Amino acid sequence: MPERSALRPSVAERVAGPGGVRERVSYAVERGERVQAYLFVPAAPGPHPAVLCIHQHHRQFHLGKSEPAGLAGDPEQFYALELAARGYVTLAPDAIGFEERQHAVLQGQDYERFEANKRLTEGSCLQAKMLWDLMRALDYLAARPEADPTRIGCLGHSLGGQETLFLSAVDRRVAVGVSSCGFSSYRALFDGAINHNFAAYVPGLLQHGDVDRVLGLVAPRPFLALAGKDDPIFPLAGVRATVRAARHAYAEAAERLRLRVFPGGHGFSAPMREAAYAWLDRWLRPGGS
């Protein structure tokens, strides 16, 4: 991982609303590289529980932070905005290659492929880069006085759900995670000849086990997996097998690992979002605070 440098945060825009303030912020992730994000802060005095909201992929590289912030895209994906209305500080950053982090010449998946290949050649991988950027997002959230650094959750759909799983596994500042349609087993993906985003593939991971080994690293912290019964890109059988195999890591905290399956495919429906928000409430604000 790169050397941790000063965040050098800045605020480019501040918009007041009835429930609080939305800020367009940026912070340094590496030397010479900054990430842009939307931050929501409730109007009530804090510190508040906070949620890092990671956007989906959907091959819509023009969308990143703006979708969970409720400014563009699919209303099913407006979870940073919806959680802010429930009293959370929320942060929605652009992933590399999306929205304000698109390349000036290479477009869409061409740039995603370039970044993945470049990092493989350097002895790393795109997943490592994405995780570093998200760890810097946690640094930023924890430094905000409105947020309680001991009550930080992570939520994402699709790519966001995938990154929620990996980030929860490697950074224990994530007190609770929710992954919506974010993983299956690699075996299920390969058996079904299903391609995914480049960050999904970590060199050598299968030599140590499947995705259940990643999920097991989250224990004993609470983790909720939401799945679509007919999700065509994250087969349900592989999701079930992953959660089942990870339960040994949760032997002393069985109630903290849960899988819920909903009708439909690769979506984040209102019932799924409500289940996600209830899980976050349960662990981040048990007394309603």
Model-derived segments and spans:
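Cap/lid segment of the alpha/beta-hydrolase catalytic domain
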Residues: I54-W132, L138-D139, A143-R144, L189-G192
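N-terminal cap/lid segment of alpha/beta-hydrolase-fold proteins
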Residues: E3-G46, A50
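Loop/turn elements at helix/coil->beta-strand transitions in domains of secreted/extracellular proteins
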Residues: H48-P49, R86-V89, P149-R151, R173-V176, ...
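Primarily recognizes the serine-hydrolase "nucleophile elbow" in alpha/beta-hydrolase
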Residues: M135-Q207
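The feature captures the conserved acid-bearing segment of alpha/beta-hydrolase catalytic domains
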Residues: F190-Y250
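The conserved beta1-alpha1 loop
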Residues: P49, I54-Q56, A227
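Alpha/beta-hydrolase-fold catalytic nucleophile elbow
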Residues: D94, L155, S180-C181, L226, ...
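C-terminal catalytic histidine-bearing segment of alpha/beta-hydrolase fold enzymes
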Residues: F198, R244-A245, Y250-S289
